[in-house]
C-alpha cells in the first residue's frame, strides 16, 4: 500500500463552523493533517470550528479564510 501525497484545498466560502465540520467528515479529511498542510496549529483550527475563536488576526485569521469562515480580503 503506497502513500499518496495529499493535495488539500481551502474550503469554499461561505462556511459556518458547523458546515466546515461537516465538510471535513463528508470528504473524509483529517483536520490535523489539513492544518499541518497549510502550516496552522491544530488547536487554532479546532477552536475556529468550535466557535471559540473568531479569526480576527494572525494565524487564526488566515486559518478562518482557508476554512471558508471569512472572505478573503481584497488587497
Task: Write out the residue ranges for each language-model feature.
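A short, Lys/Arg-rich alpha-helix, primarily the initiator
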Residues: 2-26, 70-74
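Generic structural marker for isolated residues within well-ordered, non-membrane alpha-helices
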Residues: 20, 31, 60
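Alpha-helical structural elements of signaling/regulatory helical domains
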Residues: 29, 54-55
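Short alpha-helical "recognition helix" segments of helix-turn-helix
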Residues: 34-35
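Recognition helix of helix-turn-helix/homeodomain-like DNA-binding domains
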Residues: 40-54
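DNA major-groove recognition helix of helix-turn-helix/homeodomain DNA-binding modules
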Residues: 57-74
Amino acid at each position: 500500500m503506497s502513500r499518496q501525497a495529499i493535495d488539500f484545498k481551502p474550503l469554499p466560502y461561505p462556511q459556518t463552523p458547523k458546515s466546515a465540520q461537516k465538510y471535513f467528515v463528508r470528504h473524509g479529511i483529517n483536520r490535523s493533517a489539513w492544518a499541518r498542510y497549510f502550516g496552522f496549529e491544530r488547536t487554532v483550527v479546532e477552536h475556529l470550528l468550535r466557535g471559540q475563536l473568531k479569526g480576527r488576526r494572525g494565524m487564526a485569521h488566515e486559518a478562518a479564510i482557508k476554512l471558508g469562515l471569512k472572505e478573503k480580503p481584497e488587497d
